């Protein structure tokens, strides 16, 4: 091969190498540019999310300034400013016009959304006692002439209808349950007592039932919250439920046993119905009654089901969920007697 041809061939090889290097350089530049843009966008997005979280947290803190968590877990907390409502008796005694005439029938006809098969039974024994220290706590959707939480009281459309729903759901699961429907407000009025004596009067009923029936093991005082709907409603699988809140009084020596009972139920609810339970509220004697008849039994609790704005459908779903958990807990604790 002539020297000239060899020289031309070498030149072409050199030129091809140069073009290849240029292609590689351009490709590396494009990759670098894409990576830089991606990192910049990611950084910007993270900053935006952090700012949004700060705004949300700030808004939550402003909206709920009284909640002070006092344990390693957020489920148990104290609320130092949330005293028991102390409405005047004339407010509680006033019967407002109902939006629906057959309110008892509406609550009473709510059916379980699924077929319940009771694998166990207490065989006629009543082992759960449900009562209502604030028996006239009502729900604004069913009261015609008010939208104020402090006026949500009624002699018929009240929390006792929710207690009955819970009692029926417990019975369906084989756990014999007595639902106390005595109107505490009527007893207070007949004795000329203030609303603050509600727990003293309901205590008499609890002790009377306890003396008459030695089989009673669980004592559940059902209430509704006075907070508005955004604080008493949760959504599970796109379905709205009335939130649950356990209240434990710390004004007696053995309250930690009640706290453990509440914690057990809360944990079971979290496993099956996440976020249905808002947690456990500890209340001392400086914040209200402080005992709430819970010194009678370690299995005694206040359970708030929903609030002033919740509907019968939301309340019913929550009583079904609570009955499922409470009945399973009962059978687990009494497994030897099955």
Regions found by a protein language model. Name each.
Residues 22-36:
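Hydrophobic membrane-insertion alpha-helices, especially the h-region
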Residues 258-282:
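Active-site-adjacent substrate-binding region
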Residues 280-338:
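Active-site-adjacent mobile loop/cap segments within catalytic or ligand-binding domains
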Residues 1-18:
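N-terminal Lys/Arg-rich, disordered targeting/topogenic segments
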Residues 133, 205-248:
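Active-site microenvironments of hydrolase-like enzyme catalytic domains
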Residues 2, 37-126, 338:
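N-terminal, intrinsically disordered, polar/charged segments of Gram-positive cell-envelope systems
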